C-alpha cells in the first residue's frame, strides 16, 4: 500500500510522491553519514530530493529526458461530471473501502504488538520497517509487497505481514528487492505464508534481474508447522536454491545479519555474495547454544558461538563488521554502490507530465458496485502521462480498450476491459499483444472482466478458439507484464487478462475488486439449477425455502473467498493498493523492469 511518513526536509518536487517519505532524522551522526554517501554517489548532498532522486546514478547510457514523439498523441477528453450525485455516491463508497484498508494496514504495521516491540528495542535493534527506511535512498519510493499476507489465515494466531517485509526500492541509485525479517512477530520464524512471501520476492528479483538485500533477523522455521514448511519443492530449502542460482546468473545477493540467523537460516549469509553482521545482536549458527549443550555438553553464549567477532575474525562467514544496525545499513548501501553500473533497456522519466485530471477522481468514476458500468478510458486518463492515449482499433471489439501511452516516460501497451469479451475483442487483444511484443513494449492489463461471452451464437462464432488466441498471446508474451485488478476478475477472463497464472511481473488489486471462478450469484444459480433438475428426475419437490438454504451459503462463501483481503492474504497478488496511487505504484514497478533485456517472443499455434 502507498503510505507516507512525515518528513520535514525542506523544499521537495512533489510531482511524484513516494510510497514512504523515509525517516532520516534519527541523529546527527547518521545525517553526516547520509551527507557523505550522497557526495560519494555524485548526488547533490542537500537532503531535499524528488521522489525519484538521482535517476541517472549507476545507469549507463540512460537519460531522463522526455520522449517528445509521444506528445502528438491526443489526450483523452473526460466526460465525467464530478458534481453529479452518482459521482458523489461512488466517491463515498470507495472512500469507505480505502479507509478500511488503511485501518488494517495501520494495525499490521504495529507488528508483533507493543510488548514485542519494546523487547526488540531494548536489545538496541531497529524495527524491520525502520531498517528498510534506513537503507533506501532518502525521499525515494518504496513498494511494500503483500502487507496483508497471512491475514486471518491462522485462526487466533496473528502473523502481521506474514512475519516478513518484502518490497522494491532504490538503494544507492539502484533498484533492489529487499527482504526483512520481522523478529517482533513470533521471533521472525517462518510460517508457510512467510516462506511463500520470501520466495515471491526472490521471483520478482529474478524476473527483473534486481539485486537482493536480506535484512536477517529470524529464528528459522516455525517448528509446530514444519510439515508445511520444510520438505516440498517450494518450501524453505528453495530460498537457498534461489540464492545460489541467482548468484550464478549475476544477480547480486547481499545479507545483513541483524539478529538471529539459526539452523537452515544460517545459509542466507553463507550463500550470499557479501555478508554484513552486527556486533552484539547478529548471530549465525547451524545449532544454537541449547542444541550445542544437549549434543556436546558445552555451555556457550550465542555471541561466542556465532557472533560478529567469530565470523568476521575466524570463520570468514561474514565480510563486514558493523557496530550497530545503522552502521550495518550504511555498509549495505556502500556494497550496493560498489556494484557495476547497469544499462536500462527502456526510458524512465521522473519529470514526465502528470495526468490532466486528479487521481482522486478515480473514486467517483469506479465506486464499489461492480454491476455499475463506466468507460475505462476515464481511468486510463488519470494514470498515464498527460492523459495522452493512442488508441488501437477504437471501433472494433469495443469491449476491450487497447492502445499506447507512457507512464513516467516509459511506453506501455494498455489492455483494459470495457465489458464482456466477445470474439472480436479477443482477436483485437491478440493482435495488439503481438504488436507490442514485436516492438518490445511492456504491457499493462486493467482487469474488470466477467469472462468471455457465452451462448449458441458466441460458440458458433468461435469464441473458444478466439479466446484461446488471447490466452496464448498473453502466455507467450515475453515483454514485462503488469496487471491491476480494478474491478471483477472472473473465470477465463482472468486468464485472458493476464492473471497470476500468466506470470505478470506484478499483480495489484484495488479494494473494490473481486476474484473468483464466477460471481457468487452466478454460482448459486448454477448449483440451484443442478439441484432442481436432479429433484425433477427423482420426482421430488424443490421448495423455495430449500433453494434459499442452498443459495445463501454459496453466495456468502464466494463473497468471502473473492474478497481482495482473502486473495492478498494468500499472495494471489502483490498488494492491495489505494486506486489514487496506481500511477505511482506503476511508476516504480515499471522502472524495476528496466534492468533486464526483453527477449524475442515466439508464439505457439493459433487456431484460425
UniProtKB/Swiss-Prot annotation:
Catalytic activity: 3-methylbut-2-enoyl-CoA + hydrogencarbonate + ATP = 3-methyl-(2E)-glutaconyl-CoA + ADP + phosphate + H(+)
One Pfam family of this chain: Carboxyl_trans
Residues spanning the signal sequence: none
Span of domain CoA carboxyltransferase C-terminal: 351-600
Annotated PROSITE patterns: COA_CT_CTER (PS50989), COA_CT_NTER (PS50980)
A GO term for molecular function: methylcrotonoyl-CoA carboxylase activity
Region (Carboxyltransferase): 94-600
EC number(s) from the headed UniProt entry: 6.4.1.4
Main location class: mitochondrion
Pathway: Amino-acid degradation; L-leucine degradation; (S)-3-hydroxy-3-methylglutaryl-CoA from 3-isovaleryl-CoA: step 2/3
Keyword flag tRNA-binding: no
Keyword line: ATP-binding, Ligase, Mitochondrion, Nucleotide-binding, Transit peptide
Gene Ontology CC: cytoplasm; methylcrotonoyl-CoA carboxylase complex; mitochondrial matrix; mitochondrion
Renumbered residue ranges of the record's region Acyl-CoA binding: 388-417
Annotated organelle transit peptide span: 1-61
Source taxon at top rank: Eukaryota
Compartments reported by the entry: Mitochondrion matrix
Described purpose of this protein according to its UniProt entry: Carboxyltransferase subunit of the 3-methylcrotonyl-CoA carboxylase, an enzyme that catalyzes the conversion of 3-methylcrotonyl-CoA to 3-methylglutaconyl-CoA, a critical step for leucine and isovaleric acid catabolism.
PANTHER family: ACETYL, PROPIONYL, PYRUVATE, AND GLUTACONYL CARBOXYLASE-RELATED, METHYLCROTONOYL-COA CARBOXYLASE BETA CHAIN, MITOCHONDRIAL
Name of the molecule in the record: Probable methylcrotonoyl-CoA carboxylase beta chain, mitochondrial
Lineage, uppermost ranks: Eukaryota, Metazoa, Ecdysozoa, Nematoda, Chromadorea
Gene designation: mccc-2
